[in-house]
Amino acid sequence: MPDVDLAIVGSGFGGSILAMIARRLGLRVALLERGRHPRFAIGESSSPLAGILLEQLADRYDLPRLKPLAAFGAWQRAYPDVVCGLKRGFTYFKHDAGRRFAAAPDRSNHLLVAASPHDAISDTHWLRADVDAFLMREAAALGAEYADEVQLESLEWDTGGAAVLRGHRRGAALCVRARGVVDATGPRGFLSRALGIGSQSFPGYPGTQALFSHFTGVARCDEMADYTGAGARGEGPPYPVDDAALHHVFDGGWMWVLRFGNGVTSAGVAVEDALAEDLRLADGEAAWRRLLDRLPTVRDQFAGAAPVRQFDWMPRLSYRASAAAGPCWALLPSAAAFVDPLFSTGFPLTLLGVERLAGLLESGTFFGAPRDGDEPRRQVGAVSSLQAYSDVTLAEADHTAAFVAGCYAGFPRFDDFVQYSMFYFAAASYAEIARRVAPERAAVGFLRAGDPAFAPALRTLSPAGGAARRADLGARVRDAVAPVNIAGLCEPGKKNWYAADAADAIAGAAKLGVAPENVAAALAALGF
């Protein structure tokens, strides 16, 4: 393979998008894949923040074929053969072991938070086998040197400072020489092994495991009587509850149900170690059946379902590397850390990493010194060096882990979870609008990890802190998120049903430092 400027290990969506950007910057790129497309991958649910990140990357780096992936309607028009699913919001149902679920008239046992007002600008679930293959082909079409079935075995640095990657491809020796390397695989990936990067646990985070597969024949909750009837005076939910990231929450963990447009549904569980051991999660499908037997209403939903592939068991779900970058190398956030699929944090974290590394490539800083010429345009949340990139990547992972740990602690008392979840929904909705109308207000990191008031409050009010911290939790969370609450959250009168209402964001314009008409114009352009 010819010498390149940048070797990217892993051709998932993050690696391929970074390869596309690097090619637009005029860099020579090698994109190296251990497997072969199409191939299964977990991490399938997008979000509004991920959508705007895709839009902005596409606009900044002249990648018009990337932009339709930002919204369901544009995706269907541009790429109807690339399978995705409709994600209108976030749906949560609280289950008690051994008891049937019945939607409470006061909605106290479920939560619905819309992410869009209609299908056309909705988020999506990505069938990764289709989407990753599509993005890999796009990167190759832009000139990235793509090689699959690559087994990398070593990394050395030559006397000129270039990285030399050695391995095999289909039985033949392979050598790639690059000025820099990005690991876009996953936890414990190539660079972590080759460089001996250590790992550490997230402080205070529970041990968790996961089991998942793809299914056909999964029933819709909105066609089951147990899940209907919570509206008042004919009021319907803010979106179809199944056209969402649907979560079945129970003590010790949760299940995701993500529907694709081809009749396949992704479903899996993430549970704490004690429950995993009780279920003997390593048994795969048998463990899945044991869990369904404990959740009779969920069992009914899967009564006609059949897995279309083997079950995957992850004996340790969370991971954190001790470093995310060094001289001329970096890990994408997906390779540096992983917390949990809860709240679909993986997509925006990965794309934030792509955006930051793209800025370092654009300036030349990635390779050790800024290149001559004009200073490139500053990006939202831009970092000045690979060390700064490493610091913010791991800080955001730690912050996300602290939040998810609080959510797990809140599962047994569902109202605690509902109240605490408002930290996520307030921060995410604010960031989405701020990136459109006041970018400087979005430069505090994912989930406002760098906000000197918001971030400490998120940790202080965590249900993981114990019962003493739960007194008046709802009121305390409402006060903590008030400066960034532009989505009408924390309102008892809404009874856990939150629609995507432009009026809420327009009313919150002062919190963004702009005039209401600026917000109204941005939302109108988006399609609200």
Cite the ranges covered by each PLM segment.
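C-terminal helical "tail/cap" subdomain of flavin- and related membrane-associated enzymes
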Residues: 360-528
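Beta1/beta-strand and adjacent pyrophosphate-binding region of the FAD-binding site
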Residues: 1-14, 30
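Predominantly flavin-linked oxidoreductase catalytic cores and closely associated redox partners
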Residues: 127, 133-297, 354
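N-terminal FAD cofactor-binding segment of flavoenzymes
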Residues: 39-101
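Conserved Rossmann-like nucleotide-cofactor binding loop
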Residues: 14, 37, 188
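Flavin (FAD/FMN) cofactor-binding and adjacent substrate-gating region
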Residues: 80-130
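FAD/FMN-dependent oxidoreductases across multiple families
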Residues: 251-255, 259-263, 270-360, 364-366, ...
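Glycine-rich FAD pyrophosphate-binding loop
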Residues: 7, 23-44
